[in-house]
Amino acid sequence: MNLIINDKTASSSVGQTIGKAARLNHAHVGYVCGGHGLCQACYITVQEGADCLAPLTDVEKAFLSPRQIAAGGRIACQATIAKEGTVKVLSRPEEVRRMVFSNPFQLIGYAADMGKDTAQQIVPGVQNLIGRIQRGEMGGKDALGDMIESIQGAAGLVVEAIQQGPMALPIPFKEQIADLISKLPLPQIQLPSISLPQLPSISFPQLPFSLPKLPFSLPFLPQQPQATASLEKVTITVQPPAKD
């Protein structure tokens, strides 16, 4: 099975939902409600291989507008891979990211369409939710456990990314943000010059009296004679002994 999420290949198998495959591959597809189709955080657009997926579920028919369905919209936690082939999808966060850095003005119409779709599907969505609650599909420990598992999975991804460093966080346009920050001119901060105050000069007061002179004089110390030595010239004459 060849599953491509946001232009990145993800391992998957037949019978698996796209939402489950996205979680296992750490792909940027949201999930909060535990795969019950309530939050629609995992909304995706199928760009290729729609025939490889199972038909729309009742949950998708209730929460997706006709416009979204016609555009290839699916809820990843509900869209099951039915047969082998190539399926290429685009998540909503990635779609928004591409708009931000290609044509931000598209976001105005995109947000308006999202609001219109949500308002249009409020009644069918609530009816579907009530029906599932009445059938016992949304109650009990299983549903709560699914939600807790999803939240724990999301928290685990964040913790893992933090351990790898700030830039490993699953932010949809972190590379572009980092690039923009690196190009921002840093302000030049000039520290003010600090001059220390001049210390005042301190003069000690003059004594009001003078020291008296000594009434006696020290005795004269005679100089000791210096010892001198001289070497006089000495002449030594050696005479040979007299002959008999």
Curated annotation (Swiss-Prot):
Task of the protein: Could play a direct role in the oxidation or reduction of the quenching species formed in the chlorosome.
Cofactor needs: [2Fe-2S] cluster
Species of the source: Chlorobaculum tepidum (strain ATCC 49652 / DSM 12025 / NBRC 103806 / TLS)
Cofactor note: Binds 1 [2Fe-2S] cluster per subunit.
GO biological process: photosynthesis
InterPro entries xref list: 2Fe-2S_ferredoxin-like_sf, 2Fe-2S_ferredoxin-type, Beta-grasp_dom_sf
Protein name as it appears in the record: Chlorosome protein I
Gene that produces this protein: csmI
Binding site for [2Fe-2S] cluster: C33, C39, C42, C77
UniProt GO cellular component terms: chlorosome
Single GO term (MF): metal ion binding
